Structures are given as structure tokens and as C-alpha cells.
């Protein structure tokens, strides 16, 4: 079903999992390295992708922690975000963190993560961009996020039409600013 993307996004990486958390990554830009990572739970994968954009190395974190269940502790999400934030503070290259955080952008943990990592929220001041709840738009929440270092300029954000998932597809367009 996704094979039409391969013409425009020839660089791909597939982490095929029997469980609910397989990951598929498509890119227009060459991929240098992909790390499959299990930050806090051995059955919940994330990807760290190093790519070349116009001769510059960019790091991309693709995260999707397991959704919380009633009476669940969210410590795994908190820990995963803070591990990524610590890494971002130590590295000095353009970076993005994208994914289904299973947390709204105004939650204490997401605010703490952005501040600790030194990331910008491109949605700030532009609207909620509810991404979860495609089956019932009246109960939608902004759970999918893209946070970036200040090396990127936002060109646009769009919530796309539902495509069969419980999440709306989100399209973020960024431009890497000159070094």
C-alpha cells in the first residue's frame, strides 16, 4: 500500500515487528545510519536516524512510546523523553524529534522535555492541530508532535485527511537554515 511513496522517497528503513510497534521510515535524503533503540521498554522501539541534508548531518529521533492504560504509570514516557533531551543537549547539529508522544503539548512532561532539550515547537501560536481522534473529530487531541532545533525554519503545517488510522496524518514542512 505504501509502495507509491518509494518514487519520491527512495531512502527507506523498515523495522518490522510482530507487535503493534513496527516502524517504517521514508526519506528524500540519504540516510547515513539508523539505530533501533529501546529506551525504556524492550518491546517499544524508537529510531534515531542520521541523514545528509545538503551536506549537513541532521539527527532525527522517531519516537512512539506505548500508550498509557488506565492506572498505568507514565514513567516510561517521561524517561524516554528525558533520555532524548539529554542527548540533544550534548550534540551540536540540527535535530528533530517527531512522533506520537501519547501526550498533549501542554502537559508538564512535554513542556519539560522541550525546555531541557532546547527545542522549538512549530505549532506554538498557530493552533492545536489535533492529530488523534480521526474517527471522532469532536474528541480529537494533539498527541503527535514535531520539535526542532533552531536550525530549522517552519514553512507550513497541515493536518491531512483521515486515511484509515485513528490518527490524522500530519505534514510539517521545514527548511534547514544556512550554517
Where are these regions (language model features)?
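Soluble catalytic domains of enzymes that build or remodel membrane lipids, polysaccharides, and related
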Residues: 1-179
Amino acid at each position: 500500500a505504501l509502495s507509491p511513496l518509494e518514487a519520491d522517497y527512495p531512502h527507506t528503513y523498515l523495522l518490522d515487528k510482530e507487535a503493534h510497534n513496527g516502524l517504517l521510515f521514508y526519506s528524500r535524503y540519504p540516510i547515513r545510519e539508523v539505530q533501533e533503540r529501546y529506551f525504556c521498554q524492550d518491546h517499544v522501539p524508537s529510531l534515531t536516524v542520521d541523514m545528509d541534508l545538503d551536506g549537513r548531518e541532521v539527527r532525527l529521533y522517531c519516537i512512539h512510546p506505548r500508550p498509557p492504560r488506565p492506572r498505568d504509570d507514565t514513567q516510561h514516557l517521561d524517561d524516554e523523553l528525558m533520555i532524548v533531551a539529554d542527548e540533544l543537549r550534548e550534540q551540536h547539529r540540527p535535530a528533530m524529534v517527531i512522533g506520537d508522544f501519547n501526550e498533549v503539548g501542554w502537559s508538564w512532561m512535554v513542556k519539560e522535555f522541550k525546555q531541557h532539550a532546547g527545542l522549538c515547537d512549530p505549532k506554538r501560536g498557530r493552533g492545536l492541530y489535533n492529530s488523534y481522534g480521526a474517527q471522532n473529530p469532536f474528541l480529537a487531541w494533539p498527541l503527535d508532535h514535531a520539535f526542532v532545533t533552531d536550525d530549522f525554519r517552519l514553512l507550513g503545517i497541515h493536518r491531512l485527511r483521515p486515511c484509515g488510522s485513528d490518527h490524522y496524518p500530519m505534514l510539517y514542512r521545514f527548511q534547514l537554515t544556512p550554517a
